[in-house]
Each structure stands twice: as C-alpha cells, then as structure tokens.
UniProtKB/Swiss-Prot annotation:
Subunit structure of this chain's protein: NDH-1 is composed of 14 different subunits. Subunits NuoA, H, J, K, L, M, N constitute the membrane sector of the complex.
Annotated EC: 7.1.1.-
Protein family per UniProt: Belongs to the complex I subunit 4L family.
Alphabetic keyword roster: Cell membrane, Membrane, NAD, Quinone, Translocase, Transmembrane, Transmembrane helix, Transport
Compartment annotation: Cell membrane
Gene Ontology CC terms: NADH dehydrogenase complex; plasma membrane
Protein name according to UniProt: NADH-quinone oxidoreductase subunit K
Main subcellular location: membrane
Catalytic activity field: a quinone + NADH + 5 H(+)(in) = a quinol + NAD(+) + 4 H(+)(out)
Top-level EC class: translocase
GO biological process: ATP synthesis coupled electron transport
Length: 99
C-alpha cells in the first residue's frame, strides 16, 4: 500500500473525530472522538516516519499514546465527577462544575 492511502485514511479518521466533537453532546462520545483524532495523528506520524526512513515519527507516536493514556485517566475522572453531580454526561453540564 502506498503512503498516500494511509494519509487519506488518517485524514478521514481525523475528520470523523472532528465532526463528532463538534456535533455530539455526550461527554463520553466526545471523549472517544478526541481519541480517534489522536490515533489519526499517530497514523500520520508513523506514515511520515516510514516515508523518511527514520524512527522519529514512531517515537513521537509512542509519546502521543502515553499522553493519551494519561488523558483517559483525567478525562474519565472529570466525566464521572460531572455525572455524579448532575446525573448527566452532557457536555453542556460541564460548565456547572464550578458551583
């Protein structure tokens, strides 16, 4: 497979994730769409690393995965806090945590 197909797939995945973030109101679905966008970026990094013949993109993709794992922990804790407070996982209720 040529790298063009991987880059097109990455752009498609990123676009699906971006539309999901902009359209959906459920915090868990928005969170999954952000993770989809991060995985699309990882695919792009690995593809460019393969094109250039270096491992720099693969190392960056590894660090993005590590940061994404930390993001999952913090994000789910925030979503659980919103749900416990408001009995809803809606993004619209996220600004109500300050009270």
């Amino acid at each position: 497979m040529t790298p063009t197909y991987y880059l097109l797939l990455s752009a498609l995945l990123f676009s699906i994730g971006a539309v999901g973030v902009l359209v959906r109101r459920n915090a868990i679905v928005v969170f999954m769409c952000v993770e989809l966008m991060l995985n699309a970026v990882n695919l792009t990094l690995v593809t460019f690393a393969r094109i250039n013949g270096s491992v720099d993109g693969q190392v960056m993709a590894f660090f993005v995965m590590v940061v994404a794992a930390a993001e999952v922990v913090v994000g789910l804790a925030i979503i659980m806090s919103i749900f416990r407070t408001r009995r809803s996982a809606s993004v619209d209720d996220a600004n109500l945590l300050k009270y």
